[in-house]
């Protein structure tokens, strides 16, 4: 788990395990997010008001795909089960447990895993270096660790990557190659890069 957001109320971590069939991005309609346990009791209610937020049940740690509660950078992304537009609930994973939110209370964007990863910036992690092609054959690029890449193509568990040229994430290395992005349900790269 990598820490992606922290303030005086809560710490938010990204999950290294892939859960569900995809990721749901939640956009608030009424300045609040209510997450229910499976028995319909309230797990947590986050209310946003006056550039701040309030936690009804004082949740201090969040493990999800990407949760940033700062109003200027608000992001609410959760691994989820696939859902239909007319389903009453959307089943999401938070703190490694299955919970639910009411479908019609939010504007939701659903991404299958491959589509979600294709739109992410990728950070190479130690022990899973980028494999590059050189004039002498293939080799692992030791300077790829912690470098940031954009996704060119996904084939099964392989990502074909190119170093970013957008100015994002202070990219200074000009690299491209392939990396294994998952092993079963475990992520082998960081897909939650925050610039």
What are these regions (language model features)?
Residues 1-84, 115-156, 194-195:
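Beta-loop motif signature
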Residues 73-101:
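Contiguous hydrophobic, core-forming segments of folded domains
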Residues 90-94, 159-164:
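SH3/SH3-like beta-barrel fold
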Residues 97-108, 167-190:
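A short macromolecule-binding patch
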Residues 103-120:
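Non-catalytic propeptide/linker segments at domain boundaries
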Residues 156-160, 172:
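Disordered, low-complexity tails and leader-like regions
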């Amino acid at each position: 788990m990598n820490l992606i957001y922290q303030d005086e109320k809560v710490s938010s971590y990204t999950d290294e395990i892939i859960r569900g069939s995809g990721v749901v991005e939640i956009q608030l309609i009424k300045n609040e997010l209510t997450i229910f346990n499976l028995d319909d009791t309230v797990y947590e209610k986050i209310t946003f008001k006056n550039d701040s937020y309030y936690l009804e049940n004082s949740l201090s740690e969040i493990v999800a795909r990407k949760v940033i509660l700062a109003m200027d950078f608000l992001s609410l992304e959760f691994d989820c089960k696939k859902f239909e537009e007319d389903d009453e609930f959307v089943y999401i994973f938070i703190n490694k447990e299955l919970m639910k939110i009411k479908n019609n209370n939010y504007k939701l964007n659903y991404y299958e895993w491959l589509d979600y990863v294709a739109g992410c910036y990728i950070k190479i992690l130690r022990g899973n270096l980028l494999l590059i092609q050189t004039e002498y054959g293939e080799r692992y690029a030791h300077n790829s660790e912690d470098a940031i890449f954009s996704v060119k193509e996904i084939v099964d568990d392989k990502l074909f990557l190119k170093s970013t040229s957008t100015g994002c994430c202070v990219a200074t290395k000009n690299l491209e190659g392939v990396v294994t992005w998952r092993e079963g349900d475990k992520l082998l790269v960081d897909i939650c890069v925050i610039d």
